[in-house]
Amino acid sequence: MKHTIAVLVENKPGVLARVAGLFRRRGFNIESLTVGTTERDDLSRMTIVVEGDDKVVEQVIKQLNKLIETIKVSEITESSVERELCLIRVHAPPEKRGEIVELTNIFRARIVDVSRDSFIIEVTGDEDKVSAFIDLMRQYGIKELARTGKVAMVRGNKK
């Protein structure tokens, strides 16, 4: 089962390497990892998706809490907002452009670059939406793909 863990850490050099090292030493595989600054310049937020049972996730959380730079660790189990972003360079010959534009609009994606023979399309949404769009674009020929990991927040007024 996939679990999403939010980690608030000090925004300092080497923190990401220590977190990744913790996973490596314990033999845990990171499915997805995103890191960025928060509303405070001195803090970063990591969103980590890990595959495993509840016992594995419990151990990961305990180990993360032991790191000096860790401020807060929480598993996102409640109702949450989760998003990914994907940029896809897709082959777009003149006779297929209309179809590609139509699918892009249906998914509320955006064409962010146009060249003679391709589009770069930006799609955001939950994991299933992004995956479904990628699957539809395969028939046109994906030339390049860059996909972020998941970012997530618990719904409501929680902090």
Swiss-Prot record:
Xref: Pfam families: ACT_AHAS_ss, ALS_ss_C
Alphabetical GO biological process terms: isoleucine biosynthetic process; L-valine biosynthetic process
Catalyzed chemical reaction(s): 2 pyruvate + H(+) = (2S)-2-acetolactate + CO2
Sequence ranges assigned to domain ACT in this UniProt record: 4-78
A Gene Ontology term for the protein's cellular component: cytosol
Coiled-coil region list: none
PROSITE patterns named in the record: ACT
Group of enzyme by EC: transferase
Assembly mode: Dimer of large and small chains.
Name by which UniProt lists this protein: Probable acetolactate synthase small subunit
